[in-house]
Amino acid sequence: MKASYNIQDHFLNQLRKEMVPTTVFLVSGFQIRGVIKSFDNFTVIVESEGRQQLIYKHAISTFSPARNVTLYEPDAVEVTEG
């Protein structure tokens, strides 16, 4: 059985590991710019200017990283012929 691939967790984890500057857009329209420090099923911690903010995921609209991140490992991609 193939393990499921959670794109949200993988995307956030890559942003965290690569310390990519990211703009977090909230549903209210407010923007938070910083680096993802941690996340779980319900929250994301963003560090900006030496301060940490805990943001509830239900309040987030969009993550906009300053650059693209790798979304898969080349060895992990399954190739099918046909």
UniProtKB/Swiss-Prot annotation:
GO cellular component entries: cytosol
Disulfide bonds: none
One Gene Ontology term from the biological process aspect of the record: regulation of DNA-templated transcription
Domain Sm positions: 9-69
InterPro entries referenced in this protein's UniProt entry, alphabetically: Hfq, LSM_dom_sf, Sm
Lineage top rank: taxon: Bacteria
SUPFAM superfamilies, alphabetized: Sm-like ribonucleoproteins
Keywords from the UniProt entry: RNA-binding, Stress response
Molecular function as annotated in GO: RNA binding
Subunit structure: Homohexamer.
NCBIfam families attached to this UniProt entry: Hfq (TIGR02383), PRK00395.1 (NF001602)
Entry function: RNA chaperone that binds small regulatory RNA (sRNAs) and mRNAs to facilitate mRNA translational regulation in response to envelope stress, environmental stress and changes in metabolite concentrations. Also binds with high specificity to tRNAs.
Protein family according to the UniProt entry: Belongs to the Hfq family.
Protein name from the UniProt record: RNA-binding protein Hfq
Source species: Exiguobacterium sp. (strain ATCC BAA-1283 / AT1b)
